[in-house]
């Protein structure tokens, strides 16, 4: 129901509402009256004429639903004695809005609004709220774009599991669906940002583009918050002590299900359970029925766990080569860059990170990996202490880039950049060195240069 619209009622011509007027000639007049009151937030005065239109001419104009939501929310907050009645009315308004005006409202958005209403005013059970959101998500996940509702959906499911009403496997399946949705939204957000970032840096954005970029980044930050909250809500349910018995129990029945094997192996790998014999069974079963980028990646994890990094990297590279989706390939290259960095293979790590960025410029994590690589190379670059510490400016600059292209990494990127800048030459160092505004070339594996800031 929340639409960024501005309604301007000038003259409600009789011809516009001829059919309805013939049925009830008072409707157009009351529409005009309640709209004028609602525009100036005089919701009490708007209520009676609005209700007359809503009850008698529900298909007259979409403004009945647009302003009706505001009017009823005001009544809910200002008239506690009749709150339940107004909540019921607002619920019904959500349920009929998309039926009467399908071009303006959709069922998914209306179901989300209904669930949030029931939750916010504590008038629905966990089961009721979950069922509404589950219907909305499963019927049309593409339209499910409300971060708060995504968290509520998963949170209520975990609560129902804790109450013994939902199976753990359903929690994991929904976690995969919800986090997958967040990843899709973050990718879309990142791609939008990449379109504008060069103009932003050049200072040539139009006011409309500035607003678009600000809104997109805010949405990215919202997804960052709920992503962390969803992981926290899952908590210990996804540790090895829960995962291993569950997957052992289901293995024989589902060992021919490639999607289940991918999910199970992926979760065990991410939670540090790759040392368990079950992980071997999962990976081998997956590679047997569907040799793929995923199966090769998990075989790499298997050899990593066994300490055979050479063979592990062979499988990781096979995984990258087999992957056809550019975003997924970029993610695998990012993982490879991180693993190479952890092993001190800096040049290889940089290569993988840069390849990931070429495939997916909207990814922020490769920039954080590069920033960390630069910061860990201070003693390798430069002939003086000042030049060596100057690498931290490059690290900070690179870390900030991560937050610019990927709002979900904003706080992490800002923290990393601040840490690196804290190790760079101080204001007094810059002054005493006489290097302010000069360029330092990095004649080491890092390459490139940095302009010394005039602090």
How would you name each of these model-derived features?
Residues 51, 95, 134, 248, ...:
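Alpha-solenoid helical repeat scaffolds
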Residues 297-309, 316-364:
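Alpha-helical adaptor scaffolds
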Residues 23-278, 289-290, 414-420, 430, ...:
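Preference for long, solvent-exposed alpha-helical segments and helix-linker "stalks"
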Residues 66-68, 113, 298, 335, ...:
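Canonical tetratricopeptide repeat
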Residues 128, 273-278, 308-314, 343-351, ...:
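Structural signature of tandem alpha-helical TPR/SEL1-like repeats
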Residues 35, 70, 116, 301-302, ...:
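Residue-level recognition of tetratricopeptide repeat
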Residues 1-27, 69, 308:
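Bacterial Sec-dependent N-terminal signal peptides
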